[in-house]
Amino acid sequence: MEVNVKRIGILGGTFDPIHNGHLIMAEIIRGAFELDRVLFIPSGNPPHKKNQTVTDAEHRYNMVCEALKGNPYFEKSRIEVDREGYTYTIDTLGILNEQYRGIADLYYIIGADVLYDLLTWKDYEKVFGICKFIAALRPGTGKEGFRERIKYLEDRFSASILEAEIPLIEISSTMIRNRVKEGKSIKYLVPETVENYIKKEGLYLK
């Protein structure tokens, strides 16, 4: 009996907060690569931000829940939020690989800049063996260097990296946090449900 293998995109991040840039990128990539769904995974205790203040994981997870309402192709996961200690991508992918083995192929969505950090990830060679990557290239980013990096990682480590071009969206979580702190509007930068949650919980005021 032939099994219809699904294609699942994975978008991990601190999401502090999640914003419309994340959602637009995910939707464009979902359509371009015919992904059956995109799984949003808020980080629990990210090791690369251990010297930074990160909003409580429950708040960040709740904002992701609010942001994904209304899109049947977007799902959220508590897999990292519920894990104690630092959360590493290899551990998350190991669990997802077991869960979806033979059922779905995993596509990990990253920004082009992350291509240059992949070799600092814990057990990165195992990561390359578990999933394919979709690297999002924004306008104005050096395409030649981007493709050279992809070729190097594929040739040297047998990584599988697909290229996605997305529009330039000048929104960042840092910008949103700063605007809230300064009493400025964040309307149209985040979904209205996320804006309301931030106001209700009094986030980013300090």
Swiss-Prot record:
GO molecular function list: ATP binding; nicotinate-nucleotide adenylyltransferase activity
Keyword Nucleotidyltransferase included in the entry's annotation: yes
Q: What Pfam families does this protein's entry cite? A: CTP_transf_like
Cysteine disulfide links: none
- Identify the domain of life: Bacteria
GO BP annotations, alphabetical order: NAD biosynthetic process
Provide the top EC class.
transferase
Q: Which reaction does it catalyse?
A: nicotinate beta-D-ribonucleotide + ATP + H(+) = deamido-NAD(+) + diphosphate
Cite the EC number.
2.7.7.18
Which residues lie in coiled coils?
Answer: none
Q: Which pathway or pathways does this protein act in?
A: Cofactor biosynthesis; NAD(+) biosynthesis; deamido-NAD(+) from nicotinate D-ribonucleotide: step 1/1
Keyword annotations for this protein, in alphabetical order, are: ATP-binding, NAD, Nucleotide-binding, Nucleotidyltransferase, Pyridine nucleotide biosynthesis, Transferase
Entries under HAMAP family matching the protein: NaMN_adenylyltr
Q: What's its job?
A: Catalyzes the reversible adenylation of nicotinate mononucleotide (NaMN) to nicotinic acid adenine dinucleotide (NaAD).
As for family, the record states: Belongs to the NadD family.
Indicate what this protein is called per its UniProt record: Probable nicotinate-nucleotide adenylyltransferase
